[in-house]
């Protein structure tokens, strides 16, 4: 495990893993709750996620000879992750900087009614 991955693991354990009594989305109870958003929204966590994510994207680009222009996913979970990777890409390789996008479950009910936001 790389130093970056080890640091992210430690931060996840510190910030995102909780014990106690929790009601899950399914309605079931659990004595363990993991909320990775807490780590992803932490500036140090975002930095580590960005480094690891950008390394994974670069590996995919190189091994499969791909051209990747953007990164994103469903809001809210993907937002801090894709932004961290996009920002890291811009700092590390400005000529290959990834645009970031987010996808809503439903189109907006006002304005331009967009379901996907980003710089395309």
Predicted regions and their residues:
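Loop/helix-junction capping segments adjacent to catalytic residues or to phosphate/diphosphate-binding pockets
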Residues: 40-43, 79, 110
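Glycine-centered small-residue hotspots that permit tight backbone geometry or close packing
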Residues: 45, 72-73, 109-112
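Conserved hydrophobic/aromatic pocket- or pore-lining residues that grip, position, or stack substrates
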Residues: 27, 71, 100
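Fold-independent oxyanion-binding glycine-rich loops
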Residues: 36-37, 74-75, 103-106
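Short active-site-adjacent helix-start/loop capping segments
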Residues: 32, 79-82
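Active-site-facing substrate-recognition patch
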Residues: 1-63
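Short glycine-rich phosphate-binding loop at a beta-alpha junction
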Residues: 64-77
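Short, glycine/charge-rich flexible loops or terminal/linker lids adjacent to PRPP-binding catalytic cores
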Residues: 82-120
């Amino acid at each position: 495990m790389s130093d970056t991955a080890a640091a992210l693991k430690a931060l996840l354990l510190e910030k995102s893993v909780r014990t106690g009594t929790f009601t899950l989305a399914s309605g079931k109870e659990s004595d363990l709750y993991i909320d990775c958003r807490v780590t992803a929204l932490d500036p140090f966590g975002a930095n580590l996620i960005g480094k690891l994510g950008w390394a994974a994207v670069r590996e995919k680009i190189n091994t499969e000879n791909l051209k990747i222009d953007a990164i994103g996913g469903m809001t809210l979970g993907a937002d801090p992750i894709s932004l961290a990777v996009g920002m890291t890409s811009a700092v590390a390789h400005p000529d290959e900087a990834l645009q970031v996008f987010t996808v809503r479950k439903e189109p907006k009910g006002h304005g331009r009614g967009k379901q996907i936001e980003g710089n395309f």
